[in-house]
Structures are given as structure tokens and as C-alpha cells.
């Protein structure tokens, strides 16, 4: 079973370009780990929205890796995450099961 994990962030007004720089680095890291990753930005609807979608094979592995990542962050990574958090005002996560046909 595969899953699509869609994280959606609403950026502070005018901070989307700055936030996107950080999200591109995060997405590249996921891709380097072999995780299919896409980034989206709004065209219609709510403004200043960035979406990162990951395709994952195991929920257990994903959440285990997330806990390990946050527990072992170096100072540069902490700075990147702090920058992302500083440029966003809210976020949500939606998990989908991918249906193969």
C-alpha cells in the first residue's frame, strides 16, 4: 500500500518566495532519500499557499524517520526549519491512500 502525504502551509503575506527557498531544500532532501516529492503553489483559492506532497510506502517508517530527523537536527537544519516556521502562519497535513488501478 502506498500513501500520498500532502502538507499545506499558509505563508505570512508576502513571504511565499522566501519560504519556497526553504521548502525546495526540504523537498530536495526527500528526493535524495528516494521519496517522490512535489511542490505546488496556489493559482486560485487561498493566497500565499505552498503544498508539499510526498509519496510514501510505509506510514510507520515515515513517522519513525520524522522523529529521528527532528531529534538529530544540526544547527544549520534547525535554522532552516526555524526560517520556514517564521515565514508560515499555519499548516495542515492530509494523508491519502493511493489506489493503484
Predicted regions mapped to residue ranges:
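Non-catalytic surface loops within mature trypsin-like serine protease
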Residues: 11-13, 56-58, 97-100
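Short, surface-exposed ligand-recognition loops at beta-strand->loop->(often short) alpha-helix junctions
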Residues: 10-21
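An amphipathic, aromatic/His-enriched active-site/gating alpha helix that lines ligand/cofactor pockets
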Residues: 21, 25-39, 55-92
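Short, low-order "capping/linker" segments at domain edges
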Residues: 89-101
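Active-site-flanking beta-strand signature of metal-NTP-handling nucleotidyl enzymes
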Residues: 4-9, 51
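Short, low-complexity Ser/Thr-rich regulatory SLiMs
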Residues: 41-43
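Short acidic/glycine-enriched loop/turn segments that link adjacent beta-strands
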Residues: 45-48
Amino acid at each position: 500500500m502506498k500513501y500520498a502525504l500532502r502538507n499545506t502551509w499558509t505563508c505570512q503575506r508576502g513571504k511565499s518566495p522566501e519560504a519556497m527557498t526553504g521548502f525546495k531544500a526540504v523537498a530536495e532532501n526527500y528526493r535524495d532519500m528516494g521519496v517522490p516529492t512535489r511542490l505546488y503553489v496556489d493559482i486560485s483559492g487561498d493566497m500565499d499557499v505552498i503544498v508539499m506532497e510526498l509519496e510514501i510506502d510505509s506510514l510507520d517508517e515515515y513517522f519513525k524517520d520524522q522523529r529521528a530527523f527532528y531529534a538529530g537536527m544540526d544547527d544549520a537544519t534547525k535554522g532552516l526549519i526555524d526560517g520556514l516556521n517564521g515565514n508560515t502562519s499555519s499548516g495542515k497535513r492530509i494523508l491519502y491512500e493511493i489506489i493503484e488501478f
